[in-house]
């Protein structure tokens, strides 16, 4: 094949990015553009779908130009995206009927509480693997139909289309010819049955959503359509799609059951490949579809931590004990350990596996001898402890012990955190050379579909180790530390209980 590159489009929550990869999985060029966050009122978060589209097509062209090539040198395009974010548009004009309602948006929380009060939580969970929450797309679509004048009637008449961000980009790249999504994105809507692999008529009825709005659900690695030549000069196959966390799991080459990755960003997202069968969680984790490749569906367990790297931002902007985020490592290293201080960063409640919305940020164990360095150390430690809580829940649900944790995301550059993570888990923590794993996953999915890479085995050998962190802490010390953390988490929960 004369084509030399695969273009990955990574449409995130705050920026649109395009990364060009070569056959070795190396980055050839990268372009990025941030876009506006729209906050109409407290708890509401929106994006402008046209700004997302314009920015994404712009960075795609920029990445290609930076590499000194043209569209003819691109074998395929892969798309990965912020999940759950909801767009509804007019099929005739292609114009959105409302802004994109972002995954973080909480406006439909009351409706979700009603669903739970009606006893529908278990039904929805059994079909979708998800907890009933405003986080997912279903209630957001309902809100648009209920609140945009005429939208419900137009939807009934088949005039409106719904899509997550991947669908919206593909629709625009193909000039309205293709309306599809992949199984990983569909599994985040609260409308898709992860067992039958179909949109669920009963759930659509509960939400009041006409089936005619929905995209066709495809695998994560196949040719969905071709870009219109107006965009990159030639028609290029769009051949890979996965939600961002699933794409990162694939990019980390966690393709066999029992492999797990954690992405350390503002929050943390951990995913465990559970193979060809969905595992229902008994520990408040989400059951979701990882991907469908070569006709085979693989499932995953997922746990979300609300405050990961954001705790460092709080040390900087809230407490003012560091001037730059990068200062946290050197400050924390001034002390041997946190000296019994624990920081539970429940600033927005606690995520998996606790799911306690009322818990609040808590510092325990402080004395007159506690210094800024101890607080910094406790803040970093909290990221590792929360990760341990999720991993232990995953091990319990899956009935397996994890051999190693593959890591990616901004906070993985912090050696102190990575070593403590390994210590507290008592497993190896493994950091790859290329940490752009989300975009790489999308590139792999697209490249596999067009034969750029021959097979999953073909790309397995590309994963390169940057550093392996191995446990060095004595077992009794680990036990004491974990016990202290659990007491601190209980303190954060008790504080919430006493407020009730």
UniProtKB/Swiss-Prot annotation:
It catalyses: glycerol + ATP = sn-glycerol 3-phosphate + ADP + H(+). SUPFAM superfamilies: Actin-like ATPase domain. Its EC number is 2.7.1.30. Keywords: ATP-binding, Glycerol metabolism, Kinase, Nucleotide-binding, Transferase. Pathway: Polyol metabolism; glycerol degradation via glycerol kinase pathway; sn-glycerol 3-phosphate from glycerol: step 1/1. One of its GO terms (molecular function) is glycerol kinase activity. Key enzyme in the regulation of glycerol uptake and metabolism. Catalyzes the phosphorylation of glycerol to yield sn-glycerol 3-phosphate. Gene3D superfamilies: 3.30.420.40. PANTHER family: GLYCEROL KINASE, SUGAR KINASE. Signal peptide: none annotated. This is Glycerol kinase. One of its GO terms (biological process) is glycerol metabolic process. ATP binds at residues 13-15, 266, 309, 410. Inhibited by fructose 1,6-bisphosphate (FBP). Belongs to the FGGY kinase family. Glycerol binds at residues 83-84, 135, 244-245. Sn-glycerol 3-phosphate binds at residues 13, 83-84, 135, 244. ADP binds at residues 13, 17, 266, 309, 410, 414. GO terms for cellular component: cytosol.
